[in-house]
A protein has these predicted regions:
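Intrinsically disordered, low-structural-confidence terminal and linker regions
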Residues: 2-43, 47-58
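Generic low-polarity alpha-helical segments
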Residues: 22-24, 117, 121
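Metalloprotease/metallohydrolase-associated module, dominated by Zn2+-dependent proteases
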Residues: 32, 40-46, 54, 62-111, ...
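Active-site recognition of the HExxH zinc-binding catalytic motif
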Residues: 119-131
Length: 207
């Protein structure tokens, strides 16, 4: 039996017929994968849990059943559009977008870091997964940043060095006026931030 390790990122208490259950949201940062678990007992955030795709375990103990699984294996990373926040995702979650002007690979501390993976599959995708579970943008973004950080550090570079290099390019991207935006872009982050300027540019540049 192949087991995959996840970290619990959120918990929701449920009362079902006078019986308490907990919905657990957990993510594997190494190979970006999301599971939603119906658990019979609670665990704390950041608890390491394991799953075979059907059951969820803490150690050798079964704590619940997996209700849904999402992973990045069938998600496309598209770099052919202008994206005001550098990264984004389609409404259906099947495509992650990165701004075409953002370098796809950055040289950081002597290593080549693929932004399509760090920002695309290890930030934007987890953020979309959380948003689709009705978490508000700030919390979804916070969880996604944590996943991105764990992945980046696993590559052997420091989070500070990574952020310093990324931020240089983020400022350049945001200063540009959008020329072409994907028609399927999920606008939830812009709407939450009430970024009217960005929303106006996106609507004008949709192709």
């Amino acid at each position: 039996m192949i087991m995959q390790e996840f970290e619990v990122v959120s918990r929701v208490d449920k009362d079902v017929s006078n019986r308490k259950e907990v919905l657990l949201m957990a993510i594997d940062f190494k190979e970006p994968t999301f599971i939603k678990v119906r658990a019979k007992e609670d665990v704390t955030d950041h608890t390491k849990v394991y799953s075979d795709g059907k059951k969820c375990y803490v150690g050798d103990k079964i704590i619940g059943e997996v209700l849904s699984v999402k992973n990045g294996s069938d998600v496309a990373v598209n770099t052919k559009y202008d994206i005001k926040y550098t990264g984004g995702y389609s409404l259906d979650g099947k495509t992650v977008y990165l701004d075409e002007h953002f370098p796809p690979v950055l040289k950081i501390q002597g290593k080549e870091i693929d932004i399509r993976k760090t920002i695309g599959l290890h930030h934007e995708l987890p953020e979309k997964w959380m948003a689709d579970e009705d978490y508000e943008y700030p919390y979804a973004h916070e969880v996604a940043t944590g996943i991105e950080k764990k992945y980046v550090e696993s590559l052997g570079v420091t989070w500070k060095a990574y952020c310093d290099e990324v931020d240089k390019n983020l400022r350049q991207v945001y200063s540009r006026t959008l020329e072409k935006s994907p028609p399927s872009l999920d606008l939830a982050p812009y709407l939450y931030c009430r970024d009217r300027e960005a929303l106006g540019e996106i609507r004008k540049s949709e192709s």
